[in-house]
């Protein structure tokens, strides 16, 4: 049973344009991003949301760990567990594992962010700066360039040929 003065929670579903997502991320009624992802991807919505400089509460697993700084974002611990049989299909095998959060920890963090929003808002601004500084297109271009340089062999390069001059007075034998 949940009681007390709690905020409204809305579940949104459907296809959203980039403009829709930007408006949603920056809407004044949106106070935080909460994602209990099981590890389905690198976490693009979390990365985008960080630019809004609002608190992020997310699973402490998978791709978002590359860009969410635990000093600034709230990471929910958990453990790998088998995919639920009802979710298994030909792409998601029952032998696979996904991440399950520790719900008690998640509840505690949700309440703390709600009660001490200003504190978490300051950390979120630092997370936004961290993203802009370390994950800009320019920075990613530099990093990808370094990886390519280190892992792709040097290819042959075109060079100018210096052939001897042809002597027009040379008589070539006739072939019959």
Q: Which functions belong to the PLM regions below?
A:
Residues 1-19, 24, 31:
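Nucleotide-activated donor-binding/catalytic signature segment of Leloir-type glycosyltransferases, i.e.
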Residues 21, 43, 62-67, 81-88:
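Short glycine/proline-enriched, acidic/aromatic patches that form the donor-sugar handling elements
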Residues 29-31, 53, 60:
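A short alpha->beta transition loop at the rim of the catalytic pocket in nucleotide-sugar-dependent
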Residues 38:
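Aromatic "clamp/platform" in nucleotide-sugar-dependent glycosyltransferases that forms part
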Residues 42-48, 56, 63:
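A short, glycine- and acidic-residue-rich donor-binding loop in the catalytic cores
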Residues 55-58, 74-77:
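Short hydrophobic beta-strand element within catalytic cores of glycosyltransferases
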Residues 90-176:
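C-terminal amphipathic helix plus adjacent low-complexity
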């Amino acid at each position: 049973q949940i009681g007390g003065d709690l905020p409204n929670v809305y579940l949104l579903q459907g296809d959203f344009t980039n403009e829709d997502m930007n408006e949603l991320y920056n809407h004044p009624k949106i106070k935080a991003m909460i994602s209990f992802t099981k590890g389905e991807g690198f976490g693009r919505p979390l990365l985008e949301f960080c630019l809004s400089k609002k608190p992020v509460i997310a699973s402490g697993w998978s791709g978002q760990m590359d860009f969410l700084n635990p000093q600034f974002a709230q990471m929910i611990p958990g453990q790998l567990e088998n995919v639920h049989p009802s979710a298994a299909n030909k792409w998601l095998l029952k032998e696979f594992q996904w991440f399950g959060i520790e719900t008690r920890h998640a509840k505690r963090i949700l309440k703390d962010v709600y009660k001490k929003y200003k504190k978490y808002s300051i950390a979120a601004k630092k997370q936004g700066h961290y993203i802009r500084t370390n994950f800009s297109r320019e920075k990613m271009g530099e990093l990808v360039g370094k990886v390519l340089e280190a892992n792709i062999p040097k290819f042959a390069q075109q060079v100018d040929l210096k052939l001897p001059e042809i002597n027009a007075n040379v008589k070539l034998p006739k072939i019959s």
